[in-house]
Each structure stands twice: as structure tokens, then as C-alpha cells.
């Protein structure tokens, strides 16, 4: 289950996209405006996740999907193939249904491993 995922998520009629790295029970990710930090456990095939989403970009054109600059999301779901499908809710929007589909990104698209030379990495 550990790996890098693209994430499509929504609440009510709003939706967004992010990336998320899952590793050893931790969830780290985000997008252009919000960081997503959390944890997960797997019990009897069910994934239980808790995520805090927090604004890192003060641009007012990026609206918070959860109605606030900081929100706590709780969700449960299952891994099916290369996707994790979650459903839950956020503390900032009681009663609203939150969903997320995480699709694992193919490691085959990564560049080959190697050493970084004296000049480091440059653009």
C-alpha cells in the first residue's frame, strides 16, 4: 500500500485534486494551496485514515474545499487493485459526505536511480 498516489476528492458538489505519499502509516501530500498530513491503519482489510488539511498559500483565489483553512477529515475505505476508495466527513462540515479516490502512480514512470554528482541537481 505504501507509495505515491494521485488523489481526487470531494464534498457535496465541490471537488479537488492532490498527490499523497503513503508510507508506514503516515500520509503526506498536498496541492497548490493546501498541505495534507495524516495517518492510516489497515484492520481486517479496511483502511481507516485521519487527515489534517491546512492552507499554505495565502492566495484568496484558492478556496478551501472544507469551508476553512484548517480541517480534520476522517475516512474509511478499502484497497481495490491500485485504488483506495474512502468515504467519511470533516469537522468543519458536519453531515456532509466526503469521498476520496487514491490511485497509485506507476513506479515505472520514475527516472532510474543514480548518484548525484558534484554539481547537484540543476534546472
Positions of predicted regions on the chain:
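Exposed beta-strand and adjacent loop surfaces of beta-rich binding modules
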Residues: 2-4, 37, 46, 99
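Short, solvent-exposed aromatic-acidic interface loops
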Residues: 12, 30-35, 52-57, 89-95, ...
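Short, flexible N-terminal segments of the mature chain
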Residues: 20-31
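Edge beta-strand at a domain terminus
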Residues: 42-44, 83-85, 90-123
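Tryptophan-anchored aromatic micro-motifs
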Residues: 1-13, 27, 86-88
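Contiguous, well-ordered beta-strand patches that form the walls/edges
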Residues: 32-83
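A structural detector for beta-sheet-dominated domains
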Residues: 8-10, 23, 50-52, 78-80, ...
Amino acid at each position: 500500500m505504501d507509495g505515491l498516489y494521485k488523489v481526487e476528492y470531494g464534498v457535496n458538489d465541490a471537488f479537488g485534486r492532490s498527490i499523497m505519499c503513503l508510507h508506514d502509516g503516515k500520509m503526506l501530500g498536498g496541492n497548490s494551496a493546501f498541505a495534507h498530513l495524516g495517518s492510516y491503519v489497515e484492520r481486517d482489510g479496511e483502511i481507516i485514515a485521519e487527515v489534517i488539511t491546512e492552507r499554505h498559500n495565502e492566495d484568496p483565489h484558492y478556496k478551501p474545499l472544507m469551508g476553512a483553512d484548517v480541517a480534520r477529515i476522517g475516512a474509511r475505505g478499502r484497497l481495490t487493485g491500485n485504488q483506495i476508495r474512502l468515504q467519511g466527513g470533516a469537522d468543519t462540515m458536519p453531515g456532509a459526505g466526503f469521498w476520496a479516490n487514491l490511485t497509485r502512480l506507476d513506479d515505472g514512470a520514475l527516472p532510474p536511480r543514480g548518484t548525484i554528482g558534484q554539481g547537484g541537481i540543476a534546472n
